[in-house]
């Protein structure tokens, strides 16, 4: 799997604390290796066909789309805030 970052994801990632950024990096490594890894808690977002969510921690979520072998990262940040604007 390959990763592609949207501008919004990049801006949100840059706003994370160093600790949260490290958690996201670890989650992205797992996502590339095995998108169904249990620690990521990956699930399709309600009301969407193509947007998925995964957890970098209990409080940090990231949203993405999968197109073949490409994962397009859409947003990252605090759980509730990120899921309101996937």
Language model features: what each stretch is:
Residues 29-55:
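A short, surface-exposed loop/turn module that caps and links secondary-structure elements
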Residues 2, 7-11, 15-22, 55-86:
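Enriched for short, Lys/Arg-rich terminal
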């Amino acid at each position: 799997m390959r990763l592609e970052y949207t501008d919004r994801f990049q801006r949100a990632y840059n706003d994370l604390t160093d600790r949260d950024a490290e958690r996201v990096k670890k989650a992205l490594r797992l996502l590339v290796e095995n998108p169904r890894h249990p620690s990521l808690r990956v699930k399709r977002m309600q009301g969407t066909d193509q947007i998925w969510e995964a957890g970098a921690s209990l409080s940090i979520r990231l949203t993405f789309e999968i197109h073949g072998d490409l994962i397009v990262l859409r947003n990252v940040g605090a759980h509730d805030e990120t899921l309101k604007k996937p």
